[in-house]
Amino acid sequence: MNDQPETGITPGGTSGAFRDVLSKDHARRGKPPLHFADMSEEERIGKAKELGLPKFRVKQLANHYYGHFDVNAEEFSDFPAARRSDAAEAFFPELIHEVTRQVADGGTTIKTLWRLFDGSLIESVLMRYPTRTTLCISSQVGCGMGCPFCATGQLGLTRNMSAGEIVEQVRVAAKAMRDGEVAGGSGRLSNIVFMGMGEPMGNYKSVLSAVRQISSMPPEGFGISARNITVSTVGVVPGIRKLAEEGIPVRLAVSLHAPSDELRDELVPMNKRFNTKQVLDAAHDYYLASKRRVSIEYALMRGINDQAEHAKLLAKRLNHYGDDWAHVNPIPLNPIEGSKWTASKPEDERRFLEILHNAGITATLRDTRGQDIDGACGQLAAKERD
């Protein structure tokens, strides 16, 4: 496996040109410590052999990690006492360290700021609902997509995250739910959305490895159904097509935000590389391959993309491909510090939804959890609080 951070795709220069980010460039400034979640089975067995441990100990470690969310030596009760610390240090180096934890919505929304091995900061958001618990996770440090209304997009891309760094966000949240650390008592982490910091398709190899580990049953993974995992993208077409070939029934979410190329060029710089037709073609092909409805994410911005003409054009573009293949999630824009972009008027939000519904498009206005702790969509900026 050895899924250490690979290359990504990021805007380059002021002309809108794009380039691949090489591993020696700023997207990979150093490798995190190799973690159990980064290793192939052969690498795990090899590491165990170096420690003088028999092969069957690897399966025991997998059961501890994926089945019980344990990484601490004292929890390895089935290991010889003298070997527990060695095993924990070799297989489970600390990849993410909690810096701050902010709580909102009566304790049912928790935003955590994490420090990585190199001092980089990322965030994840855990949201408990009556019938499910969703974790929004990061896949890159920062983001190179440059969307002007998104706090993460203003950071630029520092580097890709390893599979281990991604998976650890899930393990810690799953353990917190099991241990009753979230308001509502003990429960189960049920849904994962790759909608935190970063463009998941720009870190494809690590994200795919994480998806496999999240969705596989213990002791190979956490056992969260692939159907409850959402992978988002601003429209990196090669990534969408590659994901369709994997045969993993995750939901695809496309951050469209505009129905025309003229407007989307301004809101989503990646549109200069992959235009709306290319993105929607790929998204529809993903629907055909996966039999999963695609989510179309659409941040509503006052006077920019929230008028009747925009809703009508969006409906026309989606209906071009047929019925019931996409579900639109209009999202009230979440404010970010110093931004000129503001949320739509409630009456414009209602009219936008009504037009989509009348055109036969399924659409649901997105619940904006964690806005008061800058934990909602587009607000993750990984800042330490004063």
Curated annotation (Swiss-Prot):
Binding sites annotated in the UniProt record for S-adenosyl-L-methionine: 198-199, 232, 255-257, 334
Subcellular location: Cytoplasm
Pfam families according to UniProt: Radical_SAM
Chain positions recorded as [4Fe-4S] cluster binding sites: 143, 147, 150
Protein's UniProt keywords contain Iron: yes
InterPro entries: Aldolase_TIM (IPR013785), Elp3/MiaA/NifB-like_rSAM (IPR006638), Methyltransferase_A (IPR040072), RNA_MTrfase_RlmN (IPR027492), rRNA_lsu_MTrfase_RlmN/Cfr (IPR004383), rSAM (IPR007197)
A GO MF label: rRNA binding
Keywords: 4Fe-4S, Cytoplasm, Disulfide bond, Iron, Iron-sulfur, Metal-binding, Methyltransferase, rRNA processing, S-adenosyl-L-methionine, Transferase, tRNA processing
Swiss-Prot/TrEMBL GO biological process terms: rRNA base methylation; tRNA methylation
Catalytic residues of the enzyme: 123 (proton acceptor), 377 (s-methylcysteine intermediate)
Cofactor: [4Fe-4S] cluster
Disulfide bridge positions per record: 136-377
GO annotation, cellular component aspect: cytoplasm
Residue ranges annotated for the Radical SAM core domain, each copy included: 129-372
Assigned protein family: Belongs to the radical SAM superfamily. RlmN family.
HAMAP family referenced in this protein's UniProt entry, alphabetically: RNA_methyltr_RlmN
PANTHER family: 23S RRNA METHYLTRANSFERASE (PTHR30544), RADICAL SAM CORE DOMAIN-CONTAINING PROTEIN (PTHR30544:SF5)
More about this protein: Reaction proceeds by a ping-pong mechanism involving intermediate methylation of a conserved cysteine residue.
UniProt xrefs under NCBIfam families: rRNA_mod_RlmN (TIGR00048)
Role noted for this protein: Specifically methylates position 2 of adenine 2503 in 23S rRNA and position 2 of adenine 37 in tRNAs.
Protein name from the UniProt record: Probable dual-specificity RNA methyltransferase RlmN
